[in-house]
Amino acid sequence: MTPLDILILGASYGSLLATKIVLAGHNAKMICLPAEADLFNAEGAIIRTPVKGRDGLVEIRTSGLAGQLSAGGPADANPAEFDLIVLAMQEPQYSSPGVRDLLHSVAESCVPCMSIMNMPPLSFMKRLPNMNIDALRPCYAESNLWDAFNPEKFTLCSPDPQAFRPPEENLNVLQVRLPTNFKAAGFHHAEDNAMLRRLQADIEAVRFTTDDGDTIELPVKLKVHDSVFVPLAKWAMLVAGNYRCVQSAEMRPIQAAVHTDIDQSREIYNWVVDLCVSLGGAPADFVPFEKYANAAQSLGSPSSAARALAAGAKNIERVDKLVQTVAAQKGLQLASLNETVALVDGWLEKNRAAG
């Protein structure tokens, strides 16, 4: 079969999925900054990941793999030429010059589009039943950017694998901290789902030969689910962990956010899961708190949202506010979530006032 051609907007977190795609024999093009593109085109992507049963990290380089990896700027891609488009930037970045024009071209192309953002685009929220979309608009940096998309051609994939760029390394190096799976909701149309499930099967079939000659199965798969609620499993994790890294004076690691008061974390987490079930999800769509809390033990640094605020960011993804707003549509609120939203608002106001 002809390899799939997949366009990925964003090369930091996006390089992880891009590497899985290229390992499976398909082609990926990443849209990123010029310095990143030059590096990816010259050297490929380098992913370092823990593998169960092995000591240390396994290094995967995309150069020489079955598929082709390339990179360029927003003007270097025609979305209509691709089989699938993946959105892997932080939500406020889609407002930047060049990227917003490319996003509009993506919508106009009607090519199936899958978000691996923490913040589910408004186009996906339209697939959830009985959702007041206009009430959600203030949660987005620029909500009208998502209006041109056909929700039937749009889906969400939960970005569960935790990864970071080691600060001492080049921009094409990504280190996986928590090698869990990408969990995607299916598309509306059968032919789009067939393409997504083909990608899932090809990624699962990959066997990788290490430097010492061992043939191994790699973690971080793509799992496609029928339920549109499965990717929302990330909401409880973000609200109980990532956003609670934000404190009034400083940031704390995710591990501390979850484990300093484990009972409160459990209450928040289960409240968000219950909210998602009330929207139409099944309890089996979501991750039990104990499993999440155990994984959080290894997350010894603040979340990317918290780090961005501490570095002076004037906009970040607001999943905290989105969950608060969705809950309000159900007549629900949680004091600790309100407190978190207020803390994030305060940091953003301070950063914006600083100019």
Region annotations inferred by a language model:
Residues 1-52, 122-123, 219:
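NAD(P)+-binding Rossmann beta1-loop-alpha1 motif at the extreme N-terminus of oxidoreductases
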Residues 2, 168-180, 194, 198, ...:
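NAD(P)-dependent Rossmann-like dehydrogenase/reductase catalytic/cofactor-binding core
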Residues 5, 84-93, 283, 319:
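Domain-wide signal for the mature, well-folded portions of proteins, strongly enriched
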Residues 17-18, 96-99, 124-126:
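Short glycine-/acidic-enriched loop or helix-start segments at secondary-structure transitions
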Residues 18, 37, 99-104, 324:
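Short amphipathic alpha-helical segments and helix-helix/interface helices
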Residues 29-82, 103:
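Conserved N-terminal Rossmann-fold NAD(P) cofactor-binding segment
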Residues 76-121:
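Rossmann-fold NAD(P) dinucleotide-binding segment
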Residues 80, 114-241:
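Rossmann-fold dinucleotide-binding core
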